[in-house]
């Protein structure tokens, strides 16, 4: 089935990126223009107060803009009738606060998010904030939450005492752990253990245990399916296999474009993740 094609613009998406991340942004924009109707703009930061504009396919590109002029540039480029979304793929945070005051939603996407996550409380007073890692965790979070649709699991929700996560990306593991700790009753008493994995997958597995109860999620070797396992003790474990869904960068950004409200679950998860090492 072909993806829907948009002939009109639905939002302005401003990506701040550089280096290898820049090509990934352009590749994602080629898809998003067709599937989400975005008005794409790419800005790289540098030393020019008024960089010239070039066009790559349907994307407006501004190379080497001085960070302190970023807010002026975005204000002049955005269309007032369209929501504006910022996509931050820079390690530097210079200009980030100013951008947050001009966009309706800010999507963080730094290789090392430590610094930008520390800014989330400040950013969230200006705009709705999310993160590409958070979007990538959506299927994991949904499946984990479904464990608690079982009355037997809900009855034991206060008994869990250990969370173990194996991950190729430690920051994703911290964010997922932060979400679980912030959402579970007495979550702060969980002993959190993280194990590094050398696979390219951001997450490989998680297990929440307490007494005889074990809740597990693991990525299967195919990399496109997750297995959920519920072991309540005294009975054979129950399992099922579910697709991970489209995990491409364009799909993750597309999902974020459909969200408009403030995401307090993300903010709470980031706050807890800061204390997990």
Residue ranges and their predicted role:
Residues 1-8, 23, 134-153, 238-240, ...:
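Short N-terminal or domain-adjacent regulatory/targeting segments
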Residues 31-43, 79-84, 101-107, 126-127, ...:
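Structural alpha-beta junctions
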């Amino acid at each position: 089935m072909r993806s829907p094609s948009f002939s009109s613009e639905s939002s302005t998406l401003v990506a701040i990126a550089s280096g290898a991340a820049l090509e990934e942004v352009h590749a994602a924009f080629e898809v998003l223009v067709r599937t989400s109707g975005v008005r794409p703009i790419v800005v790289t930061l540098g030393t020019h107060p008024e960089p010239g504009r070039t066009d790559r396919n349907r994307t407006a590109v501004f190379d080497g803009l001085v960070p302190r002029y970023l807010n002026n540039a975005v204000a002049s480029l955005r269309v007032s009738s369209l929501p504006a979304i910022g996509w931050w793929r820079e390690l530097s945070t210079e200009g980030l606060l100013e951008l947050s005051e001009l966009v309706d939603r800010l999507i963080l996407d730094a290789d090392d998010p430590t610094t930008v996550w520390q800014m989330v409380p400040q950013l969230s007073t200006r705009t709705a904030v999310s993160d590409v890692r958070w979007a990538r965790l959506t299927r994991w979070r949904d499946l984990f939450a479904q464990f608690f649709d079982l009355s037997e699991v809900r009855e034991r929700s206060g008994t869990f005492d250990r969370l173990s996560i194996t991950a190729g990306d430690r920051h994703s593991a911290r964010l997922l752990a932060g979400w679980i700790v912030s959402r579970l009753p007495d979550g702060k008493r969980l002993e959190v253990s993280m194990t590094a994995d050398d696979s390219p997958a951001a997450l490989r597995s998680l297990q929440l245990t307490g007494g005889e109860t074990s809740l597990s999620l693991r990525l299967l070797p195919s990399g496109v399916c997750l297995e959920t396992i519920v072991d309540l003790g005294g009975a054979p474990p129950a399992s099922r296999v579910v697709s991970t869904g489209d995990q491409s960068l364009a799909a993750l950004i597309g999902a974020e474009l459909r969200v408009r409200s403030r995401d307090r679950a993300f903010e709470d998860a980031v706050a807890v993740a800061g204390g997990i090492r």
